[in-house]
Amino acid sequence: MATLAPAERHEDLTDICQQVELACVHIGSLDETERTKASDILLALPQSPCLVDVVRYLLTQSTQDAVHFHVLGAFLTGIAHVDDLLQLEGVCEWLLQRATHHASPAYVRARYVRAIVILSLRMTGLSTRTTPNSTSLLTLGKHAQSLLRTHDIMGWALASALAHEFLDQDEDRTSAGLRENEFVWCAALVQVAVIPDLVPVLLSSFHATGPSSPVWPIAADCVQAWLGWRCVSLPDTPSSHAELWTYVRDTPPEPPLPGVTLRVSPPLAPLYLHPDVATVLGHAARQAPSPVPTACYEAMLHVANYRPWSKEVAGTWPEQRAALLHVLMDLTEMPNASDDDIAALQRVTHIYTQLMYTDSGCVLMQGAVPAPMLLEALVRVSTVCLHVAFDRVPRGSQATEASDAAVD
């Protein structure tokens, strides 16, 4: 696709814009030749040597949402090969302003925010090859905080996209084209400098969200993602971000932690191990429409899995155990007779069992909650398990799945 390579003159950019707009129309054509040609044009777009200029021009000149969607997709594909930090910085801020002030459908907005997050990660990681600079990632966190305070859906979207970028456990965890230690440094910066400021604002906004608010689904997804954060092992008090980079660069990567436990690093313990986290989730589960309570229960499972980094930094963790059990007892009742909520029963049962497992269970049994409440919780768990095993399995249309749930 040599026609997409030159982008230095206005007429070249105009020609590219026309080609891409036409390709977006023909990509769904019944004619195989037209579909193939359109696909070739869109697949060639990320290879343009002037990708940033082409993307800015197309997003500015075209009024078609489909064009914006495909152009941003091409940008996400090609961004790992762009190394000009000044150019990346300019387009990142431009994309943020455009996404915030330009009305777009949700599927286009999702690509905007992912592009902004990937750009921020790439700039932060690339800076380690010259002078480590955390500005891009910290600025992204500040933007998300500012937008969250106005209950803007962009704030939730930015925060959610940033959290999800660190949840994937595959080797190729990011499309930002970073080396492993550069990606870990980004995670360390988030843990040290972004989470302490962003997550309290996020939880406060979540608690203040009205029952009829349209932001509930994305907000619940965002909260669930951040409460599932897997803490990076770091020195207790890194004196600077540059020293933090040196530590990450020189420290061999640790094996992943067991999936059943989330060890909370000492600096984050006052935030993540606070009893109010459980209270906020319970409030949202009561107030929000379906399917938000499901996300809240999944977030509660994260909280049930929390463990202090060490016994010396347990802080308010015992009080959080008690608060979460109180919230569960208020929210969950005996299962009803429908056949479609086995997964929900399984999820709630997992929260109870993780909460009453090992050290967490010892805390509860040692007086964090009254003995009658603990006994009632055990009765509820047993009742649900027996209900699934001896009621749902025999009469359910999905007997295999129900049986697996009962055994689990």
Where are the regions a protein language model picked out?
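Alpha-helix boundary/capping segments in eukaryotic regulatory proteins
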Residues: 63-67, 80-89, 100-113, 117-139, ...
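Amphipathic alpha-helical segments within extended alpha-helical solenoids and repeat-rich scaffolds
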Residues: 47-58, 86-103, 130-153, 179-209, ...
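Generic alpha-helix structural propensity
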Residues: 33, 37, 49-54, 66-73, ...
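Positions within ordered alpha-helical repeat solenoids
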Residues: 44-47, 57-61, 73-81, 97, ...
